[in-house]
Amino acid sequence: MKIIALCCSLLVAATGLVRGATPVWPTFRGPNCSGVAADAKPPVKIGPTNAVLWKVPLPFSPSSPCIWGDRLFVTAFENNELQTRCYQRADGKLAWSRGVTVEELETFHRTESSPVASTPVTDGERVVTYFGSFGLICHDMQGTELWRHPLPMALSFGGYGTSTSPLISGNLVVVMRDRDEASSLLAVDLITGKKVWETARPDSFGSFGTPILWNNHGVAEVVVPGPLRLKGYELATGRENWVVEGITACACTTPVEGNGLLYFAAWSDGKADDPWATWEELLGKHDHNKDGVLSLDEFEEISRDYYRGFDVNRDGTVEKSDYDLLLASITKGENVLLAIEPGGRGNITQSHVAWKSTRGLPYVASPLLYDGRLYCFKNGGMISSFDAQTGKAFYLQERLNAEGYYYSSPVAADGRLYVASLPGKLTVIKAGGDQPEILHQVEFGERIHSSPAIAGTNLYLRTQSALYAFGEPAGR
């Protein structure tokens, strides 16, 4: 009976089905991280001075909003607290804020991340937040703490900081704990917070995507991106069921599923089209004392955390052997978009890849599956559209007049795609077609790392300094 319940929960999460008409966007990118709000109708012409229902100041974090009914949840780091905040969707008023403090914060990128980068997840009765410096903490919808599950500090690759978000299925909370050492996939009981299972991921030195749920021929699975490998684990037990090898070495995106297939797309530097510096070039730039070894204090402060991840043996220096080992790992994988068929067990790299593409690949922005098409947004402001079943490209790397990196992942509703560039330009695109049709573009005047959230007739967007709610005022 428990397995049946878990499979039913998986179906609900994957399709976005909810009781009645309660607006639900329960986690990062909404139902099962899909980015799709099937029945929502948010406005098109939104912006910092247009269709704004409310706006509240919010400390910077790449974390995105999640929604259940009249409640909206976000994270914030303020007054040395790792905070879970609850806002009223109707007017933006703060309903409650609960924080935890730690003796030491995880290492994180000072301009591109924060110690509260993970998006909360809710089932309508509880909200669970993951902090890399603390672990998991659960509150009810009124802010009462129900349990906490402390964990060892996350040690992210390159010192970027934690970005993965937890998921809920049935009575399980699942979180990926890919670290520089002792990586694992962890499941705890939603009611008690106690560990149910934990599966080691010894070949995963760090990744930044979020796991999703997949009904793989009747088996409820957790699909987890990682360096060089995409894996599927049995939800009930944590057992590894299958692996696809040869993907990019630095997985920053989240998979999506639908149309009977599973999709993953990612890109990272270090390949022939964007090679890393040679060891000699790195020494020439940073080896100020000319000793042939790079100590961390020889790097500029803003890049020190990044290069700390290159110190493989943890002796406080980066040596040629460290760098060569990382370079060899980075160059192994392929920057690729994959469509994976269900039913496989073991290594399915050769047997269950339905189609693949190596163009138009995203770096951080996850792919979007919508109305039979798969969309990818490449850094520089380029969109590609593929037939989700066959992989045929309707168009490739078409420019959107919105340059820059894309850390925010696209979302879709009512026949439209919404995507924001890191410099702060939001673009609304008509879904479908042989060419992208831009319906609206607007500059926010500040950077956007977070992904939009959609509920009913509203769209919510977190910028560098604020949280916006967009929609038409009541009575119009």
Regions from the PLM with identified roles:
Residues 5-16:
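Bacterial N-terminal signal peptides
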Residues 18-476:
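Noncatalytic, solvent-exposed loop/strand surfaces
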